[in-house]
Regions:
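Serine-dependent protease modules
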Residues: 1-212
Length: 212
């Protein structure tokens, strides 16, 4: 069918993004507290009261916009990341680096670190997208890469308070945690939005938002 053919064409251009960063917890909140000399609790307090570095990971989505592996995603997906790995079409994994980021618009540009050629998608004219138009979202919700959902544009010019940029497309296509940074396609297979967030953290409630 039409949706299956369009999805098959677009899937190689959508990437899963995973990031890791080192998190250092707050230091001991009672730095001047001391146990009596020889107390059996002294060593235990030192062991458990000292902050321990740990690795934190996050998931997101993105899409390729040229054959050399330039990827567009949300800035909050990669912000603070020390290592970024992108998986293309659910198969090969590559390292990537940030080559541009803007916190105001919450957009980041990545470069996949390889000489391989990729299949890009192109941007459409989001200004022409109308309420009621069919759309497709492809992304990595909850780590389930290559997930495709569809719906319609429910509203335009929405404000959701995530950033100073307030002109979101609202859609009822399911968008969950991990979809952030992924593309919203029109029926021509052009990107008309970057899926950003959902209203409510427990899962999709029919209110997905996309930055045009």
């Amino acid at each position: 069918g039409f949706f299956a053919n369009l999805t098959e064409k677009l899937m190689p251009s959508v990437v899963n993004i995973s990031t890791t960063q080192t998190v250092i917890p707050r230091s001991n909140p009672f730095p001047n507290f001391q146990f009596p000399p020889g107390s059996p609790f002294e060593d235990m307090f030192k062991e458990f009261g000292t902050p321990q570095e740990r690795q934190s990971s996050a998931l997101g989505s993105g899409f390729i916009i040229n054959e050399k592996g330039i990827v567009v995603t949300n800035n909050h997906v990669i912000e603070g990341a020390e290592d970024i790995v992108v998986q293309v079409n659910g198969e090969k994994k590559f390292k990537a680096k940030v080559i541009g980021a803007d916190t105001l618009s919450d957009i980041a540009i990545l470069q996949i670190e390889t000489k391989e050629k990729f299949t890009p998608v192109k941007f459409g004219d989001s200004d022409k997208a109308r309420i009621g138009d069919w759309v497709i979202a492809i992304g990595n919700p909850f780590g389930f890469g290559g997930t495709v959902t569809s719906g319609i544009i429910s509203a335009r010019n929405r404000s959701i308070g995530l950033s100073r940029y307030e002109d979101y497309i609202q859609t009822d296509a399911s968008i969950n945690s991990g979809n952030s940074g992924g593309p919203l396609f029109d029926m021509n297979g052009d990107v008309i939005g970057i899926n950003t967030d959902i209203l409510g953290r427990s899962g999709t409630v029919g209110l997905g938002f996309s930055m045009p």
